[in-house]
């Protein structure tokens, strides 16, 4: 690459030493305006036809956008026709205002009014570029010439609106605001304000776009705060943000801009738009939601939002895209999985409605996702993740030491295969190793106990087993069935074994629920677990002993 300092220069930043926005907090959602059907659409390789537009339009209405920019009706017949359809057949709710975009050119303004005939309180969004660079290299005009473009358009629009009987709302954008000197942007905006003559009951939207993101988000916030302080008739204005994402900080720029005094935000679903995209309204809304702020948009079916986005835009959403990507609610890291597992358990036992789960800033169910994909298993996963999957999907509450033991088994498989293991495969491996044991030598069949004739408190156990398919009867002594059965198997197999830990729980609710037992067995070579599942809790325990014994003799 060329030397940075010889090819590029930093963009100037305003001097605002008494800025107040850093101490502010976002306490309510802004007025949202979707520009998917205009800014988003113009950036597509294949712009939307009517069907794709209508599907996006319906979603935006269902989500609750109060303002929707539906196109640039003077720029193409397709946009003009869609504008007419939305007004005549779109069933637009009374609390939704349609917005259209138009350049400050007389013939385009005239066509725009034709497109809006019959609309309820439509917003006419007129704009012209004001940046120093475009004044110099695109328009070859001074500030006065650029201001006249804006004021001539404002006069024409106000005149045509009055002749049409009123009912219109107005929005002005000094396009490329972030590349415009603040005093120039202020001069042009104030000239437009003087012509429109907004009131507190009929406000003018002054949109201050970061058409190209040129600086850090704090600079944009300084620019917004400075404009909010200095614009004429501030109480009759709605200050709007329209950030792009060229530097990857569109979300932060919008949030800081709201802290700096803006009232409104324009953007697109998941950030579609020219170059690196417009700001992502969904991420903004859900960021607010996770801070306890009503976002003003309904994002409860994020899967539908994703499906419509991909159909209408013919674009794919990245797997790591905030809140919507396939992997954003998934942890592979062992320590993360363990923390999530413990957090979910703590939540189930807590009385508080407040969501507090490590590594999950939002409850996936709030946006229509399930808990199934929270934890997925690969070579980086730990015992907590595996335990969570077996508990969440199959109702197994593994003792901690069994979690550690089984994690080593799964770790070996994932290392060997080099890929993720799905939940079903993990359960199958658990069943094969501990429960069904298809290649096991010993199988439990039945048992009986009766009091020891000479030792009070002890019992004699006789058990029927099969050894490689051959039926055998074995006998042992102990304080109960498990103790006696371990004694019988130890003598029969010639291996000293004893139980050091035992636990059990039901697998379903109700009187006919199956029981699962976990037995940790110590033997001369170490310790390992066995697991048994049976409708009878005692039989489940003895099957767990056999499970452990089979693993001992297989060593």
UniProtKB/Swiss-Prot annotation:
Swiss-Prot/TrEMBL catalytic activity: 3-methyl-2-oxobutanoate + acetyl-CoA + H2O = (2S)-2-isopropylmalate + CoA + H(+)
Domain Pyruvate carboxyltransferase: 30-303
EC number: 2.3.3.13
Cofactor entry: Mg(2+)
Pfam families assigned: HMGL-like, IPMS_D2, LeuA_dimer
Region Regulatory domain, residue ranges: 437-555
Disulfide bond positions: none
CDD domains reported in the protein's UniProt record: DRE_TIM_LeuA
Annotated pathway: Amino-acid biosynthesis; L-leucine biosynthesis; L-leucine from 3-methyl-2-oxobutanoate: step 1/4
UniProt keyword annotations, A-Z: Amino-acid biosynthesis, Branched-chain amino acid biosynthesis, Cytoplasm, Leucine biosynthesis, Magnesium, Metal-binding, Transferase
Entries under InterPro entries matching the protein: 2-isopropylmalate_synth_dimer, AIPM/Hcit_synth_CS, Aldolase_TIM, IPM_Synthase, LeuA-like_post-cat, LeuA_allosteric_dom_sf, LeuA_N_DRE-TIM, PYR_CT
Principal place of residence: cytoplasm
Amino-acid biosynthesis among keywords: yes
Residues binding Mg(2+), per UniProt: 39, 242, 244, 278
Cell compartment(s), UniProt: Cytoplasm
GO biological process: L-leucine biosynthetic process
Keyword field contains Metal-binding: yes
NCBIfam families reported for this sequence: leuA_yeast, PRK03739.1
HAMAP family: LeuA_type2 (MF_00572)
Record text on subunit structure and interactions: Homodimer.
Protein's name according to its UniProt entry: 2-isopropylmalate synthase
